[in-house]
Amino acid sequence: MTDLSKHTPMMQQYLKIKGEHPNEMVFYRMGDFYELFYDDAKKAAELLDITLTARGQSGGNPIPMAGVPFHSAEGYIARMVRAGQSIAICEQIGDPATSKGPVERKVVRIVTPGTLSDEAFLEDRRDNLLAAIYHHKEQFGFASLDISSGRFAVSELESLEALQGELQRLRPAEILISEDFPYTDILEGFTGVRRQGPWLFESDTALRVITQQLQVRDLTGFGCEDLTLAVCAAGCLLQYAKETQRTALPHIRKLTRERREDAVILDAASRRNLEIDTNLMGGQQHTLAWVMDRTATAMGARELRRWLNRPLRDVERVRQRQQAVSALLDGFHYEPVHDLLKRVGDIERILARVALRSARPRDLARLRDAFHALPELQEALKPVNSHHVVKLATVIGEYPELADLLERAIIDNPPVVIRDGGVIAEGFDEELDELRNISENAGQYLLDVETRERERTGISTLKVGYNRVHGYYIEISRAQSDQAPVDYIRRQTLKNAERFITPELKEFEDKALSAKSRALAREKGLYDDVLETVAEQLAPLQDAAQALAELDVLSNFAERATSLRFTAPEFTDQPGFDVEEGRHPVVEQLLDEPFVPNNLLMDTKRRMLVITGPNMGGKSTYMRQAALIALLAYTGSFVPANRAVLGPVDRIFTRMGSSDDIAGGRSTFMVEMTETANILHNATEHSLVLMDEVGRGTSTFDGLSLAWATAEHLAKNIRCYTLFATHYFELTQLADDLEHAVNVHLTATEHDDSIVFLHNVHDGPASQSYGLQVAKLAGVPQDVIRNAKTQLAHLEGLEAGSTPSPAPVSVNEPKPAAPTATKAASVEAVYQGDMFAMAEPSVVEQALEKLDLDGITPRDALNQLYELKGLLAK
């Protein structure tokens, strides 16, 4: 591929362009197709399931080729990008009619997973983010950009754990890292990871690029002047965005500094376990967002997900949102607001496309409809008694001039693209109307001229015609040609006729022959002018879009509060949680029968709840429900409870579920311990910690020891608010040993050898775990269940026969039994005894203890040995 002389001029052109874009798949425009060659063609054929063919030869071998029609290329490109590929769009920019050699082509745009703005490529209810990471030791600068809206944010993160949390929160579509970035294991699962040269992260260059983009002298006004690492990341990101878009980015006007301490922090494991907007299978069903999202607009849905993923710690801001929700609830004001917002649509992304000059006719039609809805929306907001809503209404404003412009300029139902015209409305531009009239009505015009000239001249053989060589003409038979008026100019003499032209017909000819192309050019020019006029007000329009998205979330919260019977939580400076009749917001929607609500009380005297109870009794649901109520409250939403009073929360941790990390080479137990270690290192007294089945992934004694020590550390050293679910009933002793720990349990009852889960939470420890009954429900064969019951009876008998100790020893509720010594030996390996108790010495041990080894004779020693052997046999 390097010796260009062996290739045709067209392939030489392609190879030169491909050499400039080695990391992108080049979509090379050839007439009505985009063609791909060599490895790009092979990859496209595999990913898109299209035919792989060949064109010409290279080194004696056919050149692989694949292609897609240009008019349907968007769908193919979208599939490639979703697979993590980057696409270089190479268009014909020269005129084939005038080109000598290959038509001039150039790459006009690079489409990458993180720089999408076209509606066809984007998921409408989720952000599509480009991110960049710059590191120094274990400190990280992080930047993110949504090019489809202009949101640009930076932060500095103090640990790898914090970086993982941000990646899990934002889920960027594309991530830029330096060539020497060493922590690639945390990027497992992200498809669009791109390594960039270290010079692209250089601090002076980065600062210059950012200040030029934002049109400022420094970053003091954005609070980012001291964020060296974040600025390096942001500079690389911005350069990459400009390179891919090949145009200015005027919609990127602000830089937001995100501070972790401003939000309730959730680490990566907690986000996964709580299923905020992605379930454990990677889908979106049965998540918190799935329940909470009834927003009217896609931009509102995206804002909602930002709120759910980043609850606020600033209680005043939370109360401001909550008060706005209450005001929208009063008199059901949210209902007309919701209906009007549906007419507004996703103007946030439309405005970004306006800024990038890639907005399509239907974008402008939707923008027109949105502007028409704003006056009615302002009327609907007037009775809402909320200072915050008033502020939002002021920012939203009205745009009558733009509404009028778009009403006059764009037809009601425009085509998808401007390419073929038919977008600008009749009456908007006199010249365009005339050109269209000429182009569309040329035939009728010529008939009218023919009729008029026959009447004027009285020549019956007169007719008007056209040919490609001579254009338009008036033809008169040879017999009547001498009657031609003086204003007729002879154009052509035929055997039986003369052809003439008139000044009027010549003028029409000049217009008609170029009318269609001139009309299209005129229409495109007018369309660009309309885009430019809208873009002139980009800044206030973007602010209005943000305010509309926030209003959408608030009205959505009001609707959810009504439909789901949520109540407004109260906030206090005093630590703790007091929830009456709390419910799990997602599980409640999935049940056919009513959800069983439960109370939650945690205060300075109840910092740890040790939760026991049957398998499937609802322990995990109860714990997650507590976390989701706290999360919803700190977003400004109402919560699923009759009453809720919440103290300060700085972080929410969860150690729940079990799965190994095959890619990372970590066992289930290693994953569990890693998550536990993270909690023990980072939790504070204001953290809410959910611990489910700690220690179950290893041997009984190891697991119990770790669970006990972990619970003690959380309760005594950190003093955080902990829900600690366990099947180690020994841990119920913690309530007696620790000042702030209490036992609670989930109830169940047995009926006709089956189990009924009551799902009620009561104080005190559970009596048993009903493991065999749950196994029966799961379909474990009956002979296995019977054998398990036999083994359980023996184990419980061993436990009942052991020496009592001050620490609890029961695994299940004791049932007296007396197994034989031989049977005891056979089950010794699985007996879950008391790790803190000393067993009573056996008869053999007592006899050995009495022996005087220094005074015994060899014969007596031998006799004693026989006696001991006899005792052991008994």
Curated annotation (Swiss-Prot):
Family statement drawn from the similarity comment of this UniProt entry: Belongs to the DNA mismatch repair MutS family.
Biological process annotations from GO: mismatch repair
GO cellular component, one term: cytosol
Residues that hold ATP according to the record: G613, P614, N615, M616, G617, G618, K619, S620
Region (Disordered): 799-820
Keyword Coiled coil: no
One Pfam family here: MutS_IV
Record protein name field: DNA mismatch repair protein MutS
InterPro entries given in the database record: DNA_mismatch_repair_MutS, DNA_mismatch_repair_MutS-lik_N, DNA_mismatch_repair_MutS/MSH, DNA_mismatch_repair_MutS_C, DNA_mismatch_repair_MutS_clamp, DNA_mismatch_repair_MutS_core, DNA_mismatch_repair_MutS_N, DNA_mismatch_repair_MutS_sf
HAMAP family, sorted: MutS
Cited SMART domains: MUTSac, MUTSd
Its biological purpose: This protein is involved in the repair of mismatches in DNA. It is possible that it carries out the mismatch recognition step. This protein has a weak ATPase activity.
UniProt-recorded Gene Ontology molecular function terms: ATP binding; ATP-dependent DNA damage sensor activity; damaged DNA binding; mismatched DNA binding
Superkingdom of origin: Bacteria
Keywords noted in UniProt: ATP-binding, DNA damage, DNA repair, DNA-binding, Nucleotide-binding
